[in-house]
Amino acid sequence: MQIIHTIRELRAWRKNAGKVAFVPTMGNLHEGHLALVREAKKRADNVVVSIFVNRLQFGQGEDFDKYPRTLQQDADKLEAEGVAVVFAPDEKELYPNVEQRYSVEPPNLQNELCGKFRPGHFLGVATVVSKLFNIVAPDVACFGKKDYQQLAVIKGLTEDLNFDVEIVPVDTGRAEDGLALSSRNQYLSAAERDEAPRLYRELKAVAESLAQGSLDYAGLEKRAVQSLTEYGWVVDYVEIRRADTLEVARAGDKKLVVLAAARLGTTRLIDNLEIKLP
């Protein structure tokens, strides 16, 4: 396995790499990331994993400075999975002209759901993913469904900007108690970790009500928020949306997703659950 730090070197490698699958990450890899890598391996001759903590997608007061940088441990895990290349550029490599930086702005979704609470986040995501697609030139790229809104943004930019990349969604990895795997879970105290699976349980409760025919979307959302709040969560949102577009769900929609973001202590957790109605 190679660890490549420059765009020029990666492009030289890419010329003879055959079909390439790509998994972009910020490092600090866990089993959820490795599931993306395993899916990528099924779909290509070679897998490239990028590791880059992207300052653009962190807001003021967020955890950019304390986000764990664990390149050597990550590289060891990826080598064991048979990854061909780890692309680990520094900030100057990806953003050499900070004062003249062009960006990619998602038109519809960046101010809703997580975008409402993290201004500029999805602009940062869309910009770095566009740059990485141009650099890596993958045939396939794998993204986890845990970041459901991010996945929707990436599907949109891939289509609108004519990237010749197949986007492969991968199911959310979970701990045995249902908590979605996330690099930020390590910020949780022991007591918070015990409480954290409640977020997924509330999503399942909403999904069960929808499956039983409830059309009181606002009521279901409100009850989930109240329940989480009673247990000490600070809730950004619980919302039921159309799964394919993330538009506000309407009666008669069959493919839905319930999404949530909430803080437990100082840690912001997100999760979602897809629902297909008969």
UniProtKB/Swiss-Prot annotation:
Statement: the UniProt record of this protein carries the keyword Nucleotide-binding: yes
Superkingdom classification of source: Bacteria
Residues that, per the record, bind beta-alanine: Q57
Entry's EC annotation: 6.3.2.1
Transmembrane region(s): none
NCBIfam families in the record: cyt_tran_rel (TIGR00125), panC (TIGR00018)
PANTHER family: CYTIDYLATE KINASE/PANTOATE-BETA-ALANINE LIGASE (PTHR21299), PANTOATE--BETA-ALANINE LIGASE (PTHR21299:SF1)
Protein name, entry field: Pantothenate synthetase
